[in-house]
């Protein structure tokens, strides 16, 4: 059965992660999210307080990114950022893994990094960003297995700032690896309705995009960037 606009909107994290995003742009993001009933807005942690105020009483969540976009900070810093973002009003957290540790074969350190943020989140859902464009398929599977074992809420393809974005092949691989219990978030390059529906068909359950309005109104090409 085809998804209605309302159902499609509930798969979307309406996203603005530009480092120079102004207060006015964050307010407009939130206005659009409330109007179209998106699942959440996804913003940098410094913008969480404003977004939380703008979205109070709307039912739209605020999602904050942590260790973004490089993932190369200390685990303690990532955990602190997650805790502070939640205290400021974030209802979900998207973290970037330690890619250097993964590439160096330090799988235990990668898992410990994820676990530190997961613990800091408590009951708040955690999405773990793999940055799939930089990983081999074996590395993607390894991180997905870690996330499955730790019981995080979602695995996520990309930051939208690195090399490449979400691909159908990566979404399908991630879904096969984590099974039916974890969410899969496709992000980076999902800019129109056809791409969004294809990602959902491949196994995604959430979409990170700056083109949410274009997707749900079927206006064709969406915002450049994320």
Curated annotation (Swiss-Prot):
GO BP terms: 2-deoxyribose 1-phosphate catabolic process; carbohydrate catabolic process; deoxyribonucleotide catabolic process
Enzyme class: lyase
Gene3D superfamilies in the cross-refs: Aldolase class I (3.20.20.70)
Subcellular location: Cytoplasm
EC number: 4.1.2.4
Active site, renumbered: 94 (proton donor/acceptor), 156 (schiff-base intermediate with acetaldehyde), 185 (proton donor/acceptor)
One cellular component term from this protein's GO annotations in UniProt: cytoplasm
Catalytic activity: 2-deoxy-D-ribose 5-phosphate = D-glyceraldehyde 3-phosphate + acetaldehyde
Transmembrane intervals: none
Record pathway: Carbohydrate degradation; 2-deoxy-D-ribose 1-phosphate degradation; D-glyceraldehyde 3-phosphate and acetaldehyde from 2-deoxy-alpha-D-ribose 1-phosphate: step 2/2
Keywords of this entry: Cytoplasm, Lyase, Schiff base
Entry-linked SUPFAM superfamilies: Aldolase
One MF term in the entry's GO annotations: deoxyribose-phosphate aldolase activity
Similarity comment text for this entry: Belongs to the DeoC/FbaB aldolase family. DeoC type 1 subfamily.
Function noted in UniProt: Catalyzes a reversible aldol reaction between acetaldehyde and D-glyceraldehyde 3-phosphate to generate 2-deoxy-D-ribose 5-phosphate.
Protein's recorded name: Deoxyribose-phosphate aldolase
The gene coding this protein: deoC
């Amino acid at each position: 059965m085809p998804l209605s606009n309302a159902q499609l909107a509930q798969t979307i994290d309406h996203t603005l992660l530009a480092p120079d995003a102004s207060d006015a742009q964050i307010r407009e993001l939130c206005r659009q999210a409330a109007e179209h009933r998106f699942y959440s807005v996804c913003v940098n942690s410094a913008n969480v307080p404003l977004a939380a105020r703008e979205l109070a009483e709307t039912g739209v969540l605020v999602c904050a990114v942590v260790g973004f976009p490089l993932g190369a900070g200390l685990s303690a810093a990532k955990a602190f950022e997650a805790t502070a973002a939640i205290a400021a009003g974030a209802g979900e957290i998207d973290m970037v893994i330690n890619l250097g540790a993964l590439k160096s074969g330090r799988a235990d350190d990668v898992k410990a990094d994820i676990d530190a943020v997961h613990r800091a989140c408590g009951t708040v859902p955690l999405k773990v960003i793999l940055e799939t464009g930089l990983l081999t398929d074996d590395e993607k599977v390894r991180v997905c297995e870690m996330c499955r074992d730790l019981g995080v809420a979602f695995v996520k393809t990309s930051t939208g700032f690195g090399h490449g974005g979400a691909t159908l092949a990566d979404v399908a691989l991630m879904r096969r690896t984590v099974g039916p219990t974890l969410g899969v978030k496709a992000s980076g390059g999902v800019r129109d309705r056809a791409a969004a529906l294809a990602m959902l068909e491949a196994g995604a359950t959430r979409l990170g995009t700056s083109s949410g309005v274009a997707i749900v109104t079927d206006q064709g090409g969406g915002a450049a960037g994320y």
